[in-house]
Amino acid sequence: QSGKTLKIAFFLNLGFTILEFFGGIYVNSVAIMSDAVHDLGDSLSLGTAWYLDKKSHKEADDKYSFGYKRFSLLGALINSIVLIGGSIYVISEAIGRLFEPQPSDAQGMIVFAIIGVLVNGYAAWKLSSGNSLNEKTVSWHLMEDVLGWVAVLIVAIVLNFTDNQYLDPALSILITLYILYNVVLRLKETL
């Protein structure tokens, strides 16, 4: 069951990541482009988590006399490391936009934010009933993505009424700092 939910989450996230890259360029939003890079890392992590989860269900053999259950923990560790790397990239991009602000297409951001809430929310819901630490780590991260998209939606609505070009990168930094905080907590749990 866990492999099936990880598979669904993987393909949803990968498809949405591709859409985000094109959409972020189209609406000129660093928050959406940053999230696309972040979601690419998530897709890689989900793919790894899916593979390692399948591996963790193998029976013990001569090579691994206690079985493969620890592969699920390895998936959580890899997930955390990828998220830390992606977060560092996101912060560096957003800081650049604070010094050289650029206008974003607020209407386009609203559309992507709604899609982001729906896609990530569905994937998080599918994984929320998981039993492995790997599934729980992925589910928590997808819920953080939902919160990030809600914040993007709020900022996009505000941008409809103002011309504050600092909101997009500032939001990107806040979301990323929140994600980093939670990843470090889960990384400690994994180790």
Label every PLM stretch briefly.
Residues 22-35:
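Short, hydrophobic transmembrane alpha-helix segments
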Residues 42:
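Acidic (E/D-rich), amphipathic helical modules within compact regulatory domains
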